Curated annotation (Swiss-Prot):
Family of this protein: Belongs to the SfsA family.
Gene symbol of the encoding locus: sfsA
Annotated InterPro entries: SfsA, SfsA_C, SfsA_N
CDD domains tied to this protein: SfsA-like_bacterial
Cross-referenced NCBIfam families: sfsA
Classification via Gene3D superfamilies: 2.40.50.580, 3.40.1350.60
Pfam family, one: SfsA
GO MF term list: DNA binding
Source superkingdom: Bacteria
Protein name, UniProt field: Sugar fermentation stimulation protein homolog
Length: 256
């Protein structure tokens, strides 16, 4: 299944990133010479992929319900091996492509048959949190527990090592604790969605958020499962690039 196309779309427009500002906005000079303002769904630091002057891909999708007609979808980076890689930066996509991967059978070996998938289901101690995906096993699945699946868009790398998070994330810390809470009556599955196809391994971003790293290791010891998965980003489609192994700690290095 490696290289299987999961999502196709109209060819994206390419250009140069001029700047990102006010967290949600990015000015892009298209290859046509026109300058447009695109919506940036990723409000974090985008460590290693936010590079003014770098090439980007944007989507034109005008709608009466949207203030901006353009969306920033991908960024091109040069990795430590000197290769140019396209990285998915639209944080609205990971939930969609992970669900598509499950439906395509990419997780079947790890999860067994899945009968039902629900999005954004309320859970947690207060009932105010929402799990990204709630999976119901098929009747032939040997483990009939529901699967609470939390997805994390992962774009930061150190060489071939993918890292999440790239900044302090109290929300991410809370999610780990809530995943521990659903055990043992259900399965809890953390899926780092690695939105680039040039990595071999995943680890928690201890340098960016040591509390998250500690909670990650606690979650592992309590029984939370971790399944990093990798995707390839192209101008008109996204591909499944397989699972990746993980390690429990990051070699500490300073953030750029």
């Amino acid at each position: 299944m490696i290289g299987k196309s999961l999502l196709t779309f109209s060819t994206l427009n390419e250009g140069i990133l001029l700047k990102r500002y006010k967290r949600f906005l990015a000015d892009v000079e298209l290859d046509t010479g026109h300058i447009v303002t695109a919506h940036c769904a990723n409000t974090g630091p985008m460590t290693g992929v936010l590079k003014p002057g770098g090439r980007v891909r944007v989507r034109y999708a005008p709608s009466p319900s949207r203030k901006l007609s353009w969306s920033w979808e991908q960024a091109q980076v040069v990795n430590q091996a000197g290769n140019r890689i396209w990285v998915g930066v639209n944080t609205a996509l990971p939930n969609k492509i992970v669900r598509l991967a499950i439906e395509a059978g990419c997780f079947r070996e790890a999860l067994g048959e899945i009968a039902r998938i629900r999005n954004e289901v309320k859970y947690g101690r207060t009932g105010n949190s929402r799990i990204d995906l709630l999976l119901t096993p098929g009747e032939n699945n040997c483990d009939q527990r529901q699967i609470f699946l939390e997805i994390k868009n992962t774009t930061w790398t150190d060489g071939s090592l993918a890292l999440f998070p790239d900044t302090v994330t109290e929300r991410g810390q809370k999610h780990l604790q809530e995943m521990i809470d659903v055990l043992p009556n259900a399965r809890a599955l953390l899926v780092p969605c690695i939105s680039r196809n040039d990595v071999d391994l995943f680890a928690p971003g201890d340098a960016a958020d040591p509390i998250y790293g500690n909670l990650f290791r606690q979650a592992l010891s309590e029984g939370v499962e971790v399944m990093p998965c990798c995707f390839g980003f192209f101008s008109d489609h996204i591909t499944w690039e397989g699972m990746r192994p993980f390690r429990e700690t990051q070699t500490i290095f300073p953030l750029p």
